């Protein structure tokens, strides 16, 4: 069975990688779908995020990386995928993700959403936190791959010019 793990991945964190690897213990294949979220202002372009996701997952089998602009359920329908994977860090994540799961189910009745809780070591890690810590010169190397950390520091340095 194929499932989709969507997100903005701006940037991808080791928490995301952990969810991906754990989802692969359940599903035959996982599509990591990099999406645009109009409510988020991304630091990295869609193509930059794709490259960072590819580098973070280079040693992970049974993963397909794709990009989508538009309504998520349209992508799922077009590709005949009926399972969505979402990661949960806290109760606040659950409230939002439950609303999204119910809305997606209403739009695509065959869709099931599977929630995976974050591993304890990543339960506080978010892309927003990583960007904020890096912006102030903090060390993010325990939360992202070396390639992502490098790209993040370079991007933030460019922004200060």
Swiss-Prot record:
Its cofactor is Mg(2+). Substrate binds at residues 8, 40, 72, 86. It is found in: Cytoplasm. GO terms for cellular component: cytoplasm. It catalyses: (R)-4'-phosphopantetheine + ATP + H(+) = 3'-dephospho-CoA + diphosphate. SUPFAM superfamilies: Nucleotidylyl transferase. Pathway: Cofactor biosynthesis; coenzyme A biosynthesis; CoA from (R)-pantothenate: step 4/5. It holds the Pfam family CTP_transf_like. ATP binds at residues 8-9, 16, 87-89, 97, 122-128. Its main location: cytoplasm. One of its GO terms (molecular function) is pantetheine-phosphate adenylyltransferase activity. Its EC number is 2.7.7.3. One of its GO terms (biological process) is coenzyme A biosynthetic process. The record marks 16 as: Transition state stabilizer. Keywords: ATP-binding, Coenzyme A biosynthesis, Cytoplasm, Magnesium, Nucleotide-binding, Nucleotidyltransferase, Transferase. InterPro entries: Cyt_trans-like (IPR004821), PPAT (IPR001980), Rossmann-like_a/b/a_fold (IPR014729). HAMAP family: PPAT_bact. Belongs to the bacterial CoaD family. Homohexamer. Reversibly transfers an adenylyl group from ATP to 4'-phosphopantetheine, yielding dephospho-CoA (dPCoA) and pyrophosphate. This is Phosphopantetheine adenylyltransferase. It comes from Thermotoga neapolitana (strain ATCC 49049 / DSM 4359 / NBRC 107923 / NS-E). The lineage of its organism: Bacteria, Thermotogati, Thermotogota, Thermotogae, Thermotogales.
